[in-house]
Amino acid sequence: MTKLVSTTYSENLDCRRLNVIFDLKEKDSNGNDAFTIFDESFNINVMIKKDHAVQISTQAIIEITNIDRELRNKLLAAFSLYKERTLQAPFVPVSVEIGRKSSQHLRRVFIGAVVTVDASMPPDIGVRFTCAESQNDRTIQIGTGPGTDIPQTGSFQDLCQYCADQLGLELVYHEELVAQNIQVPSYNVPYALSSLVPMLMSYNSFKIAAYIDDIYLIIRPFANAVNGPIYDINAETGMIGIPSFTESGVSFKCLADIPIPIAGGVRVTSIRNPGLDTTYITSGVVYRLESRGNEWSSEWKAYPSVLTVD
């Protein structure tokens, strides 16, 4: 495993921390898992886009510059399509963590796998990674029809749990849906894993949103935020600039390390645009992170919690 660590330097401010971790399956001389940490002399630029309106939408672009030839060659070699990598899954797991120097734990904002890698030409020695969420096996066929271990009738929660197990995810099932005890009269399991989440989204008569975020399959009523606190977003808590109206609600920009989840509740307060002051549910975000620059922000889209799906 290779861990790229970067911490900004400031005597007066709580320094930002940005970690990029590649699971390169390294081994030491004894055959044990090796863990390599590189210093902070290079630049890391990260752009992460999440949108729960589309099931396969979480992606990240990671640019690492100002690195020496040894590290550059090591990263490029790890993603070369050797014979064994074409026969096996040629995906290298990657995760991005952010936080502050004073925080004991960092927050993971992306987990996925490297899809493509490009090398920049000298003199700017660098590597650019394009990453996607960790659902590389979602096209695997799970059978030619419904399996014998899957009941053809039962609760919607059981169906969601089956889908989460097949995708290798943890199920987050909203407590309001638990209370409703939704029963599904009959269903057929799709042939490919990539069809599982769209299948769950097809139950619109229940006004349900189903999507993947991080390592979780989240099932919730469309008009309800995920369980958790409602975050106050204002000038004192980290809002950047002035929020604006959109066709579906609001867009606003804030510091990246505010732990807002997708479909989380936020309470926006703006002095310059008070007409937006209300509670929203987040629907998408773009993180822009720089280890040696000024960019450390997240741009959110959100809609009022009263919206429903017909």
Regions found by a protein language model. Give the residues of each.
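An acidic/polar, Gly/Ser/Thr-rich interaction patch typically located in mid-to-C-terminal regions
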Residues: 48-49, 53-85, 218-310
